[in-house]
């Protein structure tokens, strides 16, 4: 077979296969061009999710007839010079997008240079140019793409449903819009307006906050920490969710390098590490984080789609991002999610399940035998006689405190304990419901971490060594092979037969633990990991298992002094708003929200 040169048309179709995967790819390239063109307003129109029609209009600098003719040729661009290949500030620079799109569609470009007298238009069908003509158009550029992939029907067959393809285009526009809050964006699909974002012209932080509210939502901002972190050659800003506000997937993680939306495994891992003390393994933080870095320290020319980057010093970037997120979270370490959702949970049963309020009341019913009310204004506490276990007198009684006491403490003064599990406390303008078990988990976690860090995790020798038989010899071998690492965690074990482990020492904090259950849990959990698991990673997992056993003792009756002591410890502890499984440790109900429960 003879070697020959490929035709220009074939080359463009091959390039299109790399750059243009779906309608969203076209939307991305055209919107990015509009941003690079200095636009303040960008309109996107789609029909059938872009399969039939894509129109992107802007009010940017526009093009002359000569520029228009050159723009649709391969490797032509106004955004790159020979000298600044390592100093790229624009979205595009390869000069591939327009000719690649034109090769697989029917393209019409109309453009008018700012302050020019005439507009010009060029049409391309399957990459074949027609003559440029004079047209009528406002300043800026309008690009119409019809019948995408008509020249490559095989690619057309692989497109997904209109719903899926539309979602991909929406996601692209939202990401670009987040990075450019000064630009207005408008997206219409099948004559229906799906996205309308007004550009802001205030300071950067205000612009960014409003754009995030418009794109991600007001609830996210209310449950997020602001990041503002700088080094001599690096800066990070944006918002990241508090640990109690999380998702089951990473879809709501928006990451940007020099305003370029990216999907980078290094940064995603950094996010996981930053939250590893506060989120369960299957939960993900929400964020919109913008990293500004010297362009010479990052390579964006990794893939034609430019969604991947390479850092000159990836470990430095990773560590800086982790530090920035942790600093931001520390500022809101005692904040839990807004009480709005909790109020709705209270309110819905009242609306749906309560009997009609005008139902006749039988004053002779048995209920009156159990409950009596004293409406004396001077009464401090109403006594209720219930057909259930009596609450301890010192826990159930009301305690008088002056207003200054309530102002003094963030979590207020303990008033009662429910079901030996929940503490009710009162603040100046709210009531707080605290989950004892979750609080003990967080307290234990912080305590064990502190002891490990300072070498204070003392061993407790068992009076009688405990023999634990595991379900397989493989699990026993795994624990035994990691015995030196476990020893550093104050757990001393030896092999005892084929499937058994003998335990001679446990951490002093867990001296009352069920050793059988502890070792079984360790074996089950850790056997899923590599036999050569790093000590740091092993410590992370073992601590979490320790805490589960440490906090079992939490479900018990507490005296008033014990409850208040627990509240004071929460106030002096970092990240007291959630346990290490991401459950909130408390819910605060403001008086104004409680009043809403009783409104019709």
UniProtKB/Swiss-Prot annotation:
CDD domains documented for this protein: HATPase_MutL-MLH-PMS-like, MutL_Trans
Keyword tRNA-binding: no
InterPro entries according to UniProt: DNA_mismatch_repair_CS, DNA_mismatch_repair_MutL, DNA_mismatch_S5_2-like, HATPase_C_sf, MutL/Mlh/PMS, MutL/Mlh/Pms-like, MutL_C, MutL_C_dimsub
PROSITE patterns the UniProt entry points to: DNA_MISMATCH_REPAIR_1
Keywords assigned: DNA damage, DNA repair
Gene Ontology biological process terms from the UniProt entry: mismatch repair
UniProt entry tagged with the keyword Membrane: no
Coiled-coil region list: none
GO MF annotations, alphabetized: ATP binding; ATP hydrolysis activity; ATP-dependent DNA damage sensor activity; mismatched DNA binding
Gene Ontology cellular-component terms listed: mismatch repair complex
Pfam families referenced in this protein's UniProt entry, alphabetically: DNA_mis_repair, HATPase_c_3, MutL_C
Family: Belongs to the DNA mismatch repair MutL/HexB family.
PANTHER family xrefs: DNA MISMATCH REPAIR PROTEIN MLH, PMS, MUTL, DNA MISMATCH REPAIR PROTEIN MLH1
Task of the protein: This protein is involved in the repair of mismatches in DNA. It is required for dam-dependent methyl-directed DNA mismatch repair. May act as a 'molecular matchmaker', a protein that promotes the formation of a stable complex between two or more DNA-binding proteins in an ATP-dependent manner without itself being part of a final effector complex.
Protein name: DNA mismatch repair protein MutL
Gene name, Swiss-Prot/TrEMBL: mutL
């Amino acid at each position: 077979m003879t070697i020959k040169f490929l035709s220009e048309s074939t080359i463009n179709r091959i390039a299109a296969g790399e750059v243009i995967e779906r309608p969203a790819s076209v939307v991305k390239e055209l919107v990015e061009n509009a941003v690079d063109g200095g636009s303040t307003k960008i309109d996107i129109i789609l029909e059938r999710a872009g399969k039939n029609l894509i129109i992107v209009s802007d009010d940017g600098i526009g093009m002359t007839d000569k520029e228009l003719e050159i723009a649709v040729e391969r490797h032509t661009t106004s955004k790159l010079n020979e000298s600044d290949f390592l100093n790229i500030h624009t979205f595009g620079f390869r000069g591939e997008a327009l000719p690649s799109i034109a090769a697989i569609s029917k393209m019409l470009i109309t453009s008018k240079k700012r302050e020019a007298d005439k507009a010009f238009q060029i049409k391309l069908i399957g990459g074949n140019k027609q003559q440029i003509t004079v047209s009528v158009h406002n300043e800026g550029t309008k690009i119409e793409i019809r019948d995408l992939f008509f020249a490559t029907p095989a690619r057309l067959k692989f497109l997904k449903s209109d719903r899926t393809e539309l979602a991909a285009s929406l996601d692209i526009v939202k990401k670009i819009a987040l990075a450019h809050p000064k630009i207005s964006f408008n997206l219409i699909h099948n004559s229906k307006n799906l996205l309308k974002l007004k550009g802001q012209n205030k300071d950067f932080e205000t612009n960014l906050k409003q754009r995030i509210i418009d794109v991600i939502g007001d609830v996210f901002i209310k449950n997020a920490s602001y990041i503002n972190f700088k080094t001599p050659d690096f800066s990070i800003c944006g918002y990241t969710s508090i640990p109690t506000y999380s998702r089951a997937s990473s879809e709501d993680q928006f990451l940007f390098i020099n305003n370029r939306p990216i999907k980078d495994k290094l940064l995603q891992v950094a996010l996981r590490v930053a939250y590893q003390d506060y989120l369960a393994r299957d939960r993900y933080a929400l964020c919109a984080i913008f990293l500004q870095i010297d362009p010479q320290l990052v390579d964006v020319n990794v893939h034609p789609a430019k969604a991947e980057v390479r850092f000159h010093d990836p470990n430095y970037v990773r560590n800086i991002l982790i530090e920035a997120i942790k600093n931001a979270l520390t500022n809101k370490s005692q904040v839990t999610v807004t009480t709005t959702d909790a109020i709705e949970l209270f309110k819905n049963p009242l609306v749906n399940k309560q009997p009609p309020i005008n139902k006749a009341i039988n004053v002779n019913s048995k209920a009156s035998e159990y409950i009596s009310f004293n409406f004396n204004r001077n009464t401090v506490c109403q006594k209720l006689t219930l057909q259930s276990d009596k609450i301890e007198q010192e826990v159930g009684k009301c305690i008088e405190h002056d207003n200054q006491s309530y102002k003094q403490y963030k979590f207020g003064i303990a008033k009662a304990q429910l079901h030996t599990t929940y503490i009710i406390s009162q603040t100046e303008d709210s009531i707080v419901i605290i989950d004892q078990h979750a609080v003990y988990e967080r307290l234990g976690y912080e305590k064990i971490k502190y002891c490990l860090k300072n070498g204070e995790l003392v061993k407790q020798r068992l009076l009688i060594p405990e023999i634990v038989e595991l379900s397989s010899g493989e699990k026993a071998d795994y624990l035994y092979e990691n015995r030196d690492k476990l020893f550093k965690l104050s757990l001393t074990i030896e092999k005892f037969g084929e499937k058994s482990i003998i335990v001679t020492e446990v951490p002093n904090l867990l001296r009352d633990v069920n050793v059988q259950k502890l070792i079984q849990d360790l074996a089950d959990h850790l056997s899923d990991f590599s036999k050569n698991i790093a000590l740091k990673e092993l410590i992370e997992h073992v601590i979490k298992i320790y805490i589960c056993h440490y906090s079992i003792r939490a479900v018990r009756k507490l005296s008033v002094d014990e409850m208040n002591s627990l509240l004071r410890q929460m106030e002096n502890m970092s990240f007291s708003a959630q346990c290490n499984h991401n459950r909130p440790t408390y819910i605060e109900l403001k008086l104004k929200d409680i009043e809403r429960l009783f409104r019709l």
